[in-house]
Regions:
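Loop/turn elements at helix/coil->beta-strand transitions in domains of secreted/extracellular proteins
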Residues: 32-36, 68-74, 105-107, 114-117
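Typically the conserved alpha-helix immediately C-terminal to a functionally engaged Cys/Sec
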Residues: 49-65
Length: 145
């Protein structure tokens, strides 16, 4: 019985998908009338990036919220050979960085609308709880258009 409960929790738990193509993310955001959260990360070398992912972006509270309210885009810039991205993904990430993160900040997170207009940004690790992070995003989600 316990195994069944665990299985159901895993299957029924909300999940989120981090996209790698900003154009596709904008299309999805337009179709679903959602905002886009872009996260620039160095997943295998940037301590604050890893902390942001583990403490906020992978928290149950954020995953539950994002699954219903956001389109997520991750532009990752790993350094270790075992984590190398495809050449196509590297080009997509570099193009996104040219547009939104020319200074090369890590971590750098932005909330943008479906047209790509920046609504809010977080430079570095946001020293707050997942709930506080969500509240900041939610203030833009609930604004009339």
């Amino acid at each position: 019985m316990k195994l069944l409960a665990i299985y159901l929790l895993l299957v029924l738990s909300p999940s989120v998908t981090w996209m790698g193509d900003f154009s596709q993310a904008k299309n999805e955001a337009a179709q679903k009338h959602r905002l886009i959260l872009i996260n620039f990360s160095g997943s295998d070398w940037c301590g604050p990036c890893i902390r942001l992912r583990k403490e906020i972006l992978e928290s149950d509270a954020f995953v539950n919220y994002a699954s219903d309210h956001l389109v997520l885009v991750r532009a990752d810039f790993p350094r270790q050979k075992k984590n190398q991205l495809s050449k196509e993904q590297v080009k997509l990430n570099e193009a996104l960085a040219d547009k939104y993160n020319a200074d090369g900040k890590f971590p750098y997170t932005l909330l943008v609308d479906e047209n790509g207009k920046v609504l809010k940004d977080w430079d570095g690790f946001p020293n707050e709880t997942p709930e506080q992070f969500i509240a900041q995003i939610n203030s833009f989600v609930q604004q009339p258009k």
